[in-house]
Regions:
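Conserved acidic
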Residues: 1-195
Length: 195
């Protein structure tokens, strides 16, 4: 039930100002920035409210994409980032224990607890004390792709251009496929908390 890339529904009509954004290697960059990997997970804010709302939307005959329309993150993450003292969250820790905390307490634990932590939009708490395997691999692939792009640029107009361009494209596909592999139940790297 993870959301994919956000694509807004078009708004019909003439508009004076429009804009678009395309972030370079968005998903690989997010994985690297949050140090997302199974070995870096500290805890998971249980998505009780979010999953209940998703179930309601699906029961009404709508698709999961309609639930996520206009939303950036799960309800629990939003409460944490808003430092809601009246909202209770359950955090499932990587050691198998659980804690009840207010959303504000979760925020303070992550951002003011004196530990190198980060929280993702789905409420997963990651440590960045040491680089994760997957973020490290993506960093290497990204650097390799930049090298291949430079070689393709140098070879523009020669017989070698297609060779280097296709090689950099393979790296791009590897980079962009990593997020999908992490959230594909058939993948050996599957972990719902990463999505």
């Amino acid at each position: 039930q993870a959301a994919g890339a956000y694509v807004a529904f078009p708004k019909k009509g003439m508009h004076d100002w429009i804009g678009a954004i395309d972030i370079n290697s968005l998903y690989p960059s997010a994985i690297r920035a949050l140090n997302m990997g199974p070995e870096t997970i500290v805890g998971q804010v249980r998505q009780t409210r979010t999953l209940a709302s998703i179930d309601e939307v699906i029961a009404s005959g709508k698709g999961i994409a309609e639930f996520w329309e206009g939303k950036f993150a799960c309800f629990e993450y939003e409460s944490v980032m808003n430092r809601d003292i009246g909202q209770t969250e359950i955090v499932d820790w990587s050691d198998g224990t659980s804690s009840e905390m207010s959303s504000a307490e979760v925020y303070n634990f992550v951002f003011h607890g004196g530990q190198p932590l980060m929280i993702s939009g789905n409420g997963t708490i990651f440590s960045y004390a040491s680089k994760g395997v997957i973020p490290g691999l993506l960093e290497r692939w990204y650097a390799e792709r930049k090298e291949l792009q430079a070689k393709a640029k140098e070879a523009y107009g020669t017989d070698m251009f297609d060779f280097w361009d296709k090689r950099q494209l393979v790296k791009k596909i590897n980079l962009n496929s990593a997020y999908g592999a992490l959230l594909n139940a058939g993948s050996r790297f599957f972990d719902q908390r990463l999505g």
